């Protein structure tokens, strides 16, 4: 079934988002487990720490989105990579905006 329980409420997903999120989590965990990718993630951390994480992430989102249906055919891994780099971009966004968003939240909810 396409539902889950959140805050004691039943929610029906229209586009199987719950399954997609589970699949994405498995994909991400596998990328961390793969030996050859340990250096890749170390490089990604250096890029993010160097202040270039957003451009790097957006560039990879575009790369894999454009590649879908071409280089490897309709490879679901290209879509999972788009989502993973989107999460990295969200992480970078949150790092760069954490203080201002926290202050904005406090002012809206006080």
Language model features with spans:
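Intrinsically disordered, low-complexity regulatory regions
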Residues: 2-110
